[in-house]
Structure formats: structure tokens, C-alpha cells
Design a protein with these regions (language model features):
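Hydrophobic alpha-helical interaction segments
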Residues: 148-149
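A structure-centric signal for secondary-structure junctions around beta-strands
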Residues: 2-4, 12, 28-29, 92-94, ...
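Unchanged
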Residues: 39-67, 77-135, 139, 162-167
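Conserved N-terminal beta-strand and adjoining loop/helix that marks the start
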Residues: 1-17, 39-40
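Conserved Nudix-box catalytic region and its N-terminal flanking loop in Nudix hydrolases
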Residues: 15-56, 153-167
Length: 167
């Protein structure tokens, strides 16, 4: 199992996203997604560590530092039956989601992950994204915290195995 974090920074009707660069073995290659990435082993051990991981990943990818992010949810990306063009049977990925409404810093023009952009909330559903990410954005629109599972069979979202429970 892998562990990661994602940050949902929403300011004045716009959401901070990354247009990912195209690369092999990246399920988000060429897609739009939230800033985030793998947690370091010491960050996984506590809520504070996971929060610091979200702040770190967002700053690395976008140049922006989240102010007072709050925990929003946790998603298990159930990947054992998932396939990509050149990547068979990836590991499950447990992702902690944090939300912020304020930030400091200057937006980078690009990073190793892609191009950070402010996207109008009304446009997000029209962007090229992973099926699982589209489901995650639906859950984030609700103001409640959540626990979710996103499951794929092959390269298709398995709706019957995908679920959310609001807390």
C-alpha cells in the first residue's frame, strides 16, 4: 500500500489544480488533478505529519503554502484490479485530503509534476481527469468530511465497488 495526500485549495470560486505532464506509469499523465503526492514515512504516523505532508507537496508542486488547512477526508484508491497501458496491477493508495481557503506565495509557472493552474469550479467537470478524481470532486463539493473507496476494474471505474460515507 502507498500513502499520499491531496490538497483542495478553493479561493473565490477557483480551485488550484495541476495539469500533469505526460509520462509513463503515471495514472494522471496529461490529466488535471489536485496537488499532492506520496507521504514520507515519518509523515504517515500522525495527523500532524499528514497535514505537513499536504503543505509540503502543495508548495513543491505549486509554490503556494496552504494556510490553516483542515482534514476533509480519506480515500482508498483500490487499485489491485486496475490496469494502465504499461502498468499492470498497481498498489492500493490511501490518500488523505486536506482543504484550505487561504494561502501565501506566488504560483509557479511549472514544476516537475506539471503546470499549476487556477480553474473555475464550474469548469472542473469538463476537464480531462481520471474517473476516480471526478468522483472525488463530487464528494468534495459536499461540506461534510468523508471516507471513500474508489475502485477500478481494468481501466474503468467500478461504480458498484466505489462508495462514500459522510461523517
Amino acid at each position: 500500500m502507498k500513502y499520499g495526500t491531496m490538497s483542495y485549495l478553493s479561493v473565490d470560486g477557483k480551485v488550484l489544480m495541476i495539469q500533469k505532464i505526460k509520462r509513463e506509469n503515471d495514472p494522471n499523465s496529461g490529466y488535471y488533478t489536485l496537488p499532492g503526492g506520496k507521504l514520507k514515512p515519518y509523515e504517515r504516523k500522525s495527523t500532524q505529519g499528514r497535514l505537513e505532508g499536504a503543505i509540503r507537496e502543495t508548495k513543491e508542486e505549486t509554490g503556494l503554502r496552504l494556510i490553516n488547512p483542515v482534514f476533509r477526508g480519506i480515500i482508498l484508491f483500490h487499485n489491485r484490479e486496475r490496469t494502465f497501458d504499461n502498468w499492470k496491477n498497481p498498489q492500493d493508495y490511501l490518500v488523505y485530503i486536506f482543504e484550505a481557503k487561504k494561502y501565501t506565495g506566488i504560483l509557479k509557472s511549472s514544476s516537475d509534476e506539471g503546470i499549476p493552474l487556477w480553474i473555475d469550479e464550474t469548469e472542473i467537470s469538463n476537464l480531462p481527469q481520471n474517473h476516480g478524481d471526478k468522483k472525488m470532486y463530487e464528494w468534495l463539493k459536499d461540506s461534510r468530511n468523508f471516507k471513500g473507496i474508489i475502485k477500478h476494474r481494468g481501466n474503468i471505474l467500478d461504480e458498484s465497488g466505489t462508495s462514500v460515507r459522510y461523517l
